[in-house]
Amino acid sequence: MKKMKSVLANFILTTSLVLQGASGFAQDRDAVKQLSDETIRPFKVHIPQAKLQDLRSRILATKWPERETVADASQGVQLATMQALADYWAKHYDWRKVEARLNALPQFTTNIDGVDIHFIHVRSKYPNALPMIITHGWPGSVIEQLKIIGPLTDPVAYGGKAEDAFDVVIPSLPGYGFSGKPTTTGWEPVHVARAWITLMKRLGYNKYVAQGGDWGNAVSEIMALMAPPELLGIHTNMPATVPAEISKSLASGTQPPAGLSADELNAYQQLGFFYSKGLGYAQEMGLRPQTLYGIEDSPIGLASWMLDHDARSYELITRVFEGHKEGLSREDILDNITLYWLTNTAISSARLYWETFQLPKAGFFDPRHVAIPVAVSVFPDEIYAAPKNWAEKAYPKLIYYHKLDKGGHFAAWEQPQAFSEEMRVAFKSFR
């Protein structure tokens, strides 16, 4: 038990290392040769039919275990959920539909530090649109953001005003989706942040904002710490705000500090649950990602691994496959899982955790002391709901804080209209 607490204490992830100097990162590590090719190349998706047939065959050939011995998800992803998902995936799901949606959008690749970066880039038809780079996390992808492209780039068609328009840049993280897979070490969130700054320069933007949750928050906050003059501010739906005394208490497994407000106690309990029961996936990917051959070889293995990310997302997905109408559809969920399968990125995406674990230990949710303007949207079913006073302490230039009544970890995907409205309000002052 002591060893487990020590592992958890070290885990409380690791990306805040940039407190000690993200701005100096480029000097050292750019022994990685910069390629002179800055070409931006159009990109289309086409998956060979043989790959889709192979996927279906593998699903139908799944070797199932016995049912869990409990009535809930305390032993992991439940057999009934996985069998319902597998049945729909093999018999009804059509990858070509999302492939067509992707190919209807302007997609590109460009090489940064030796890795081809895939991104969607949609310019608004409205003048003076504010450029925004949006970063996904794990187990997400650019699929998460497809529903917000319309409301952000064409707000008039979705109840907004022309002056609310954004240009959107939505990259796939290195090792994820249609981006290239790094063949050397060193692609952790600091390197990704620097690559995104390069990407926005390459696209010719002299001002922009950044948005992210999950790894996207880490990347966006690190971009803010690097403070390129073009970056006006950031928005996060999974903020890093946990005070030091809270992190210390959680890591040691002691009682919460006295005097917490109701919101603070709720956040403490949510974080406590996540750290004690929700970190299995991150521990394995952070320590031994190459061992995950099973999820690279079995679509059901991959799907169950991705579903076991956080309890509330799992509950939502279970309800969807039971036939309930929720923020996500069965197609949404399978689009994302199938993207990971077809691009063979189960292990390459996991390496982002390993890369981060190699860095000096600091907490993923620990404040990074971002000095530029920050906006925060709190969705109730996120891993933890950051209290306003924590956000105010973490972000000296907090320009916006709002608690919503619906939505979770995949906020843009689950609640695209509400998420888009948050972006319009949060970044209004930068117009």
Locate each region found by the language model:
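Short beta-strand element of the alpha/beta-hydrolase
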Residues: 129-137
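The serine-hydrolase catalytic nucleophile loop
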Residues: 138-150
